[in-house]
């Protein structure tokens, strides 16, 4: 196999760079033979800032600029500077905005400033704080504030899934199922909440738990990786979810993002929002 092509990818935004980073990373995932050096330039608000970016680029290398810049003058300046230095410059949102505008015959809002602190931003911060405070069954006294409740046995990715959802703006409580201990929630009182169970292949869970014990230098906890106990835990969670008609997601072959996306689909359906079908 030949050497990988090397690309210096410069991601530029007058906002947080979150959008351009997400799109760029999704795009380069399609090129496994490509080695990418990523440079993130966020909160670019002046022509002098653009000048510094352009001057820092090594023109002997393969360079590509991907950007989201709302300000018309600054955007044009970036494009002209890149063109002058023979650097390819790709807008992320311009085509989409143009298509929406043409399709609906409406002009884009000239006063839109997505990088300003918005209600959505503060709601996201609130969701993150709430979710952290309610990790691993903590602070269940105000569970009514949750949008989503996740239950599952130990090491089924409840916490990272919860944090990912919180970053999307959902307040999440995750509750561990402990063998022979009743779940500390009243299922009848949660009828209006989305409660989701996470399950996993038994052998896979034992492997994850064994690796966890090794990393903690605690290999004496035999029950934690006992096939019989793990099987009982999984069976009990499955039974509880079936009894309460809670959706159950098998995370054995799922990434955190895929699990979260499935949960969001369940949330949208429960709240009569468009979200498509969820496949577990």
Curated annotation (Swiss-Prot):
- Which residues are in coiled coils? none
Sorted alphabetically, the keyword list is:
Kinase, Nucleotide-binding, Serine/threonine-protein kinase, Transferase
Which is an annotated Pfam family here?
Kinase-PPPase
Entry's EC annotation: 2.7.11.32, 2.7.4.27
Question: Binding positions for ADP?
Answer: 152-159
Q: Which domain of life is it from?
A: Bacteria
Q: Which reaction does it catalyse?
A: N(tele)-phospho-L-histidyl/L-threonyl-[pyruvate, phosphate dikinase] + ADP = N(tele)-phospho-L-histidyl/O-phospho-L-threonyl-[pyruvate, phosphate dikinase] + AMP + H(+); N(tele)-phospho-L-histidyl/O-phospho-L-threonyl-[pyruvate, phosphate dikinase] + phosphate + H(+) = N(tele)-phospho-L-histidyl/L-threonyl-[pyruvate, phosphate dikinase] + diphosphate
Tell me the GO molecular function terms. Answer: ADP binding; ATP binding; phosphotransferase activity, phosphate group as acceptor; protein serine/threonine kinase activity
Q: What does this protein do?
A: Bifunctional serine/threonine kinase and phosphorylase involved in the regulation of the pyruvate, phosphate dikinase (PPDK) by catalyzing its phosphorylation/dephosphorylation.
Check the record and name the NCBIfam families matching this protein. Answer: PRK05339.1 (NF003742)
Question: What does the sequence similarity comment in the record state about its family?
Answer: Belongs to the pyruvate, phosphate/water dikinase regulatory protein family. PDRP subfamily.
Q: What is this protein called?
A: Putative pyruvate, phosphate dikinase regulatory protein
Q: Which organism is it from?
A: Anaplasma phagocytophilum (strain HZ)
